[in-house]
């Protein structure tokens, strides 16, 4: 079985979509402690932090070595003109950002940290360092020109406040996206092509389409 180190419902739905049976373990990693201005490095470190936190929980519960085959930590952020847009903290910030994003483009970066749970190793450091791979997948997103009415109406819904950049491409936010250049599932929360390629790397493609 597969472990997803994320509470994101969108990521869970992506795994359900490809019939990847999984257990969710929400990490205790404190994202606020990471003050990194570079978006690519930051999202990579966040993904690793989440994965390592979930791995620690598994080891403490004595499950990692006999129950699960792989663990994935993910995190996403939106980069707009060199500035990092994470989840909006309030309606005012969301509206302000959308007024800037309207008719413009930016990049959705998702960091991935995949750990193959090797039964021959018993400590966290050995497992995480010697049986892991990481990567950042970036998708360019171009937004439509939006009216103040549209922005305010979207900001009045609950959807954008749990999303990096303040939009959900798979939800109502998809109405405002003109086009993307890159991986679609990456914008939702994780790159399925990246996951498939790296599960194959560890001989774990059998976990996919396990209906």
Curated annotation (Swiss-Prot):
Cofactors demanded by this protein: a divalent metal cation
Catalytic activity: a ribonucleoside 5'-triphosphate + H2O = a ribonucleoside 5'-phosphate + diphosphate + H(+); a 2'-deoxyribonucleoside 5'-triphosphate + H2O = a 2'-deoxyribonucleoside 5'-phosphate + diphosphate + H(+)
Active site, renumbered: 75
GO cellular component: cytoplasm
Xref: Pfam families: Maf
Main location: cytoplasm
Coiled coil regions, renumbered to chain: none
InterPro entries recorded: ITPase-like_fam, Maf-like
Keywords: Cytoplasm, Hydrolase, Nucleotide metabolism
EC assignment: 3.6.1.9
Leading EC class: hydrolase
Subcellular location: Cytoplasm
GO biological processes: nucleotide metabolic process
Gene Ontology molecular function, alphabetical: nucleoside triphosphate diphosphatase activity
Entry-linked Gene3D superfamilies: 3.90.950.10
Family: Belongs to the Maf family.
Physiological role: Nucleoside triphosphate pyrophosphatase. May have a dual role in cell division arrest and in preventing the incorporation of modified nucleotides into cellular nucleic acids.
Protein name: Nucleoside triphosphate pyrophosphatase
Lineage: Bacteria, Bacillati, Cyanobacteriota, Cyanophyceae, Synechococcales
């Amino acid at each position: 079985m597969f472990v997803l180190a994320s509470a994101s419902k969108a990521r869970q739905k992506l795994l359900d979509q490809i019939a990847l049976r999984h257990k969710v373990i929400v990490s205790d990693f404190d994202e606020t402690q990471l003050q990194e201005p570079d978006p690519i490095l930051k999202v990579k470190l966040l993904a690793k932090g989440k994965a390592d936190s979930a791995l620690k929980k598994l080891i403490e519960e004595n499950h990692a070595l006999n129950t699960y085959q792989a663990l994935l930590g993910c995190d996403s952020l939106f980069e707009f003109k060199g500035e990092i847009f994470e989840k909006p903290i309030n309606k005012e910030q969301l509206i302000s950002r959308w007024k800037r994003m309207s008719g413009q483009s930016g990049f959705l970066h998702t960091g991935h940290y995949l750990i193959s749970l090797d039964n021959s190793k018993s400590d966290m450091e050995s497992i995480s360092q010697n049986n892991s791979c990481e990567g950042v997948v970036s998708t360019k997103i171009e937004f439509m020109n939006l009216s103040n009415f549209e922005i305010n109406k979207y900001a009045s819904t609950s959807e954008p406040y749990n999303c990096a950049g303040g939009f959900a491409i798979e939800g109502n936010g998809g109405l405002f996206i003109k086009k993307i250049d890159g991986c679609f599932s990456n914008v939702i929360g994780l790159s399925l092509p990246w996951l498939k390629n790296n599960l194959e790397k560890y001989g774990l493609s059998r976990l996919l389409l396990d209906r």
